[in-house]
Amino acid sequence: MKITIITVGKLKEKYWKMAVDEYVKRLGAYSKIELVEVADEKDSDNMSEKDIEIAKRKEAERILSKVKDDSFVYTLEILGKQLDSVQLAKEMEQKMNTGKSHLTFIIGGSNGLHQNVMDRSNYALSFSKMTFPHQMMKVILLEQIYRGFRIMKGQAYHK
């Protein structure tokens, strides 16, 4: 099983990098993890809707160029389906059991995802109706994937 996580923007703060590294290390026992960061567009508070759409489209082109054709794609969206940890574990396990050997999770930038990325998505997943910084979301996602593997294996981490 290979899992790719594509994010818009780079992790800059050391504490986020340390958390990501810790979960990537833990996940190594279960899966090959690939982290892909694509450049984000410059953002300002006074961007017009048109400018935001152009920025999202440019980010979408970068994201989609990194998505493999054979990958099952999850996009993280506020309006996606909310699952608890056990349900996410079952979702991932079901994909593995039906021959999906490559899962890709996509986290958008500060303006969200362009429709082209959502159109490529096989599953819109939501962790909350709230918005989180993409740096934090990357750590939360990695933790939940790790928790999911522990649940699948019947290991005690999730209790």
Swiss-Prot record:
- Which InterPro entries does the entry mention? Alpha/beta_knot_MTases, RlmH-like, tRNA_m1G_MTases_N
Main function? Specifically methylates the pseudouridine at position 1915 (m3Psi1915) in 23S rRNA.
In its UniProt entry, what is this protein called?
Ribosomal RNA large subunit methyltransferase H
Q: Which GO terms describe its cellular component?
A: cytoplasm
Task: Fill in the subunit field for this protein.
Answer: Homodimer.
NCBIfam families in alphabetical order: PRK00103.1-3, tRNA_RlmH_YbeA
One Pfam family this chain carries?
A: SPOUT_MTase
Similarity comment: family membership: Belongs to the RNA methyltransferase RlmH family.
Q: What is the main EC category here?
A: transferase
Q: Which domain of life is it from?
A: Bacteria
Q: What is its EC number?
A: 2.1.1.177
Q: Which keywords belong to this entry?
A: Cytoplasm, Methyltransferase, rRNA processing, S-adenosyl-L-methionine, Transferase
Reaction equations catalysed: pseudouridine(1915) in 23S rRNA + S-adenosyl-L-methionine = N(3)-methylpseudouridine(1915) in 23S rRNA + S-adenosyl-L-homocysteine + H(+)
Check the record and name the CDD domains matching this protein. Answer: RlmH-like
Q: Which GO terms describe its molecular function?
A: rRNA (pseudouridine-N3-)-methyltransferase activity
Q: Which residues bind S-adenosyl-L-methionine?
A: L76, G108, F127, S128, K129, M130, T131, F132
